[in-house]
């Protein structure tokens, strides 16, 4: 009889990728995935620590799991093994056992390949096991090949960690220094994914455009080199990458956007603020004019490229003038979509120790203003697509039985009617008929 594995994933696409790999790791040991937490023998929370709210979600979920465990005991059933993985695990370590002593295993994002051994120890009645080692090479060397197809659009982690040390960010402390996978390893995984039916691959990294992986003969590949290598794979039709840092946007990578048709005309390029003073305080290593120059060069390389970004409002010391500079940058760049957040002090980061924290109500006011502007830009872009035809990759079911959902080259969700679902996994020409803030509707173009 197989054992059941339940994984709940928080945060970024890298965590989604890691969760798939945890699933692949445990399958040979008899653990099959389930979406029903109540039948799980092992429960893994793959956590995010980028903001305080994200971290607290972990403890809230652990509280719910504790109630589930208590109910199982009353019924005479065995308790599930509880694992906290990911960036909260890396950041808080033993504190997790202090706050939630019923957790069995705490494992960081660079050491989860040891999960089979850790779980077997818990089965043998060992308790409070922790593994937070930063051994990136061992992690990638010991991860299994893909067992469960991810679908028409799949992720591959090619780079982890960050050396930039932005003063608001925990990534260097939770994911470690920048590390790039070797080229052959990435290529083999991409080949396997495409052979299982994927049409699109998203290359992942905390700072993916800093990629500097080696080949077997010690030649160093940049991200542009890696893309040129991967697009040769037969039946791979689309390639994307995220997340990028402006200072690592090389001339070669920028020009590749205009030369390689498989590289999609959409780029997530976080700037965080439009104020030079705030950018310096954040240790972003560039100013607003540098960012504008990157955007101009990208648009010269490919006129139809669409940008998205991340913004943080209320970083310590941010004034009304600084916030006005952010709004000015947003209005000048004109984004297709964006993510925006209130600054959240993270323990251990320089920003958290500053005495000029912005009051919460001011952060909220600024976020409301910024999100209104960003939403207007996103809606305007979506509405500009009405009447056009786009190639859409349909990769998932919709809410209704006769509906499927796909992605445009610009990462917009598109809904169409397809009762027999025969278009899933295919790229189809669609005429856009309606637009909303977060999605498009269309019909098959004939």
Swiss-Prot record:
It catalyses: N(6)-dimethylallyladenosine(37) in tRNA + (sulfur carrier)-SH + AH2 + 2 S-adenosyl-L-methionine = 2-methylsulfanyl-N(6)-dimethylallyladenosine(37) in tRNA + (sulfur carrier)-H + 5'-deoxyadenosine + L-methionine + A + S-adenosyl-L-homocysteine + 2 H(+). GO terms for molecular function: 4 iron, 4 sulfur cluster binding; metal ion binding; N6-isopentenyladenosine methylthiotransferase activity. It is found in: Cytoplasm. Pfam families: Radical_SAM, TRAM, UPF0004. CDD domains: Radical_SAM. Keywords: 4Fe-4S, Cytoplasm, Iron, Iron-sulfur, Metal-binding, S-adenosyl-L-methionine, Transferase, tRNA processing. Its EC number is 2.8.4.3. Its cofactor is [4Fe-4S] cluster. Gene3D superfamilies: Methylthiotransferase, N-terminal domain, tm_1862 like domain. HAMAP family: tRNA_metthiotr_MiaB. Belongs to the methylthiotransferase family. MiaB subfamily. This is tRNA-2-methylthio-N(6)-dimethylallyladenosine synthase. It comes from Rickettsia bellii (strain RML369-C). The gene is miaB.
